[in-house]
Amino acid sequence: MAKQLLGKPVADRLKERLSAEIEKRRRMGKALGFAAVRVGDDPSSVVYQGRLVKAAATLGFEPLEIALPEESSETEVIEKLKALGEDEKIAGILLFMPLPKGLDKDRISRAIPIEKDVDALNPVQFGDVMAGRSLWAPCTARAVMEMADYYEYDLTGKHVVIIGRSDVVGRPLAQLMLARNATVTVCHSRTKDLALHTRSADLVVPAVGQAGILTGDMLKPGAWVIDVGINVRPDGQGIIGDADFASCEPICEAISPVPGGVGAISVTMVLEALLRDQD
């Protein structure tokens, strides 16, 4: 039976450190407001936003949950973000991805002040990450690294296959892995014979939001799987990851479950970024 890479102990360790810092900043009168902004009703974003707002309130932040309509114009979204950026009570802003079709992510992200951009969406901040000048990457990418560190997985020389090339996980995670001397392969929707790549991997990170894209027959024995995917079950009851847990678990040495894995850490990494952005 594979070792389960649980997110809760990782998140709990982070929360202990954050709690003291939050109380310190409260006494100093620093802003603790947090704007969680979603445009449309992408299922994974709805789930993530709910978890994030709840966790933020529990730790002592002052979360503001914002859901803009699917049909919102680019101008409307930008104006909302600019208003939040000018609000002195708001310490940080997180804009959930993906955005509805027709909205330009880069133009919209520029409306988030760099000092309040908790997920490195502003092109300037993102560019620093991709150039290797900053390790302050999007929170989910950092959560994967935090999990690997907690479970003492040495990335040096390992072949890591990342499934997905999004700006919030795949691309920045590849840079973070390279900084740890891993050999990284990034696969995506146009990759031919995905299994050819995953069968040679020491660590596979599925991160596309496609349930079952990774199955046990696509892994070599003893591989690790850190599942970033969040998908609503077909019956609408709960969530599942991108990896087919039932077939992967007997093959793996270690695997993160969904729910119960990276998600809990991602939430805490966002809250950590809120504190960092006030420094």
Enumerate the predicted regions with their spans.
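Anion-binding alpha/beta catalytic cores of soluble intermediary-metabolism enzymes, centered on
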Residues: 92-155
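Rossmann-fold NAD(P)-binding glycine/threonine-rich loop
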Residues: 106-122, 126, 229-279
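Positively charged, low-complexity intrinsically disordered leader regions
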Residues: 1-30
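N-terminal glycine-rich anion-binding loops that anchor highly charged ligand groups
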Residues: 24-35, 40-58
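Glycine-rich phosphate/diphosphate-binding loop of Rossmann-like nucleotide-binding domains
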Residues: 39-53, 135-224, 228, 233, ...
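Short glycine-rich anion-binding loops that position phosphate/pyrophosphate groups of nucleotides
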Residues: 96-102, 210-212, 230-233, 261
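Short beta-strand elements in bilobed, periplasmic/extracellular small-molecule ligand-binding domains
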Residues: 34, 56-70, 184-186
